[in-house]
A protein has these predicted regions:
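GHKL (Bergerat-fold) ATPase N-terminal catalytic module, capturing the glycine-rich phosphate-binding loop
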Residues: 1-180
Length: 180
């Protein structure tokens, strides 16, 4: 099972893979939240540290996040690190080294709810921008959605951004606490 966070409109792949990219900052839409270009990246790391699978579809492009063991040598010690990687599928098949390690954000991005709130906030931001400052109609008709889905429902939807987070007890608690 996965939690699906879906919004109309296709986020750029770089919004999940390039630190500092924010399409919401200075967008001119009242109520938009995002601005720093780091939230998605921190959210991905929280989930990877928790051992949860995350799959993102930016339209038809699939993003699978994983880590690769590496070692940093500063001349005094050799420190093992886990580099965060993104394997693309669909419209591209390359693997991107994202340029940060799993410990990025580990001191202050510590809870599953923080990562889930980030994805939901980004979905609302995009919907606000896509729908001329309104998100309630998209929520009511299902274009903007935060719902559990079974594994076989994990797939792309043209014209949409879809974030799938592996469902565990912590993710389910977050879903249960959402306003109905």
């Amino acid at each position: 099972m996965f939690l699906l966070v879906q919004n109309p409109g296709v986020a750029p792949v770089e919004g999940f893979t390039l630190l500092g990219v924010s399409t919401t900052r200075d967008c001119g839409v009242e109520g938009a939240i995002g601005q720093f270009g780091s939230g998605n990246k921190h959210a991905i790391n929280v989930l990877l540290r928790a051992g949860l699978k995350i799959i993102v579809y930016c339209g038809k492009t699939r993003l699978d996040f994983q880590t690769r063991d590496d070692e940093i040598d500063d001349g005094l010690i050799r420190k093992p690190v886990k580099r965060v990687m993104c394997k693309l599928g669909g419209t591209s098949t390359r693997t991107i080294d994202l340029g940060w390690v799993l410990d990025f954000g580990a001191i202050d991005w510590t809870e599953l709810g923080m990562s889930l709130r980030e994805f939901v906030s980004n979905a609302i931001d995009r919907t606000l921008r896509q729908e001329n400052g309104e998100f309630i109609p998209a929520m009511l008709d299902g274009r903007l959605a935060v719902v559990p889905v079974c594994d076989e429902k994990v797939k792309a939807k043209d014209g949409y951004t879809r974030v799938y987070v592996e469902l565990n007890a912590g993710v389910q608690r977050y879903v249960d606490d959402l306003p109905k």
